[in-house]
UniProtKB/Swiss-Prot annotation:
Belongs to the pneumoviridae M2-1 protein family. Contains a zinc-finger domain on its N-terminus essential for its anti-termination function. Contains an oligomerization domain. The central globular core is responsible for binding to RNA and phosphoprotein. The keyword Zinc-finger applies. The keyword Zinc-finger applies. Residues 125-161 are annotated as: Binding to the phosphoprotein. This is Protein M2-1. PROSITE patterns: ZF_C3H1 (PS50103). It is found in: Virion; Host cytoplasm; Host nucleus. Residues 75-169 are annotated as: Globular core. The gene is M2-1. The record marks 7-8, 91, 149 as: Involved in RNA-binding. Its main location: virion. InterPro entries: Pneumovirus_M2-1, Znf_CCCH, Znf_CCCH_sf.
Amino acid sequence: MSVRPCKFEVQGFCSRGRNCKYSHKYWEWPLKTLMLRQNYMLNRIYRFLDTNTDAMSDVSGFDAPQRTAEYALGTIGVLKSYLEKTNNITKSIACGSLITVLQNLDVGLVIQARDSNTEDTNYLRSCNTILSYIDKIHKKRQIIHILKRLPVGVLCNLIQSVISIEEKINSSMKTE
């Protein structure tokens, strides 16, 4: 075992375990190295406490300024703007607002809307696709990644079907 401090341990955490040949004993380290480790640790804490970044923006690119567009236009407004190519709505913003719409949809109402119109096969297919996305919604990072990888045409068709199904559900709720 060397007396030299492990550079990975100085920067945070050494994942080599017993295979590491360098010193992990802090009391043997020189003061300069201890100060350097303290600086790394404080920077890491500061990075995690920074309010400008959050987990959702790290994964999907769907950060705070984009969520304000959703707040101003509404989730359906963002989706319609993406379809019409207005208001400078990007694919990641549309995927994020699509997820919020899917979270707000009730599975039972979507199944009821699907069963009410059994003649149209395209409508049945889109309802089943929406139900499968609703089932996967508990894995938010994964579903954002899946939606962002969809081709633009497929994503636009999915958005149109979600909007039409949501409007049908809302109109049936208002009549009852």
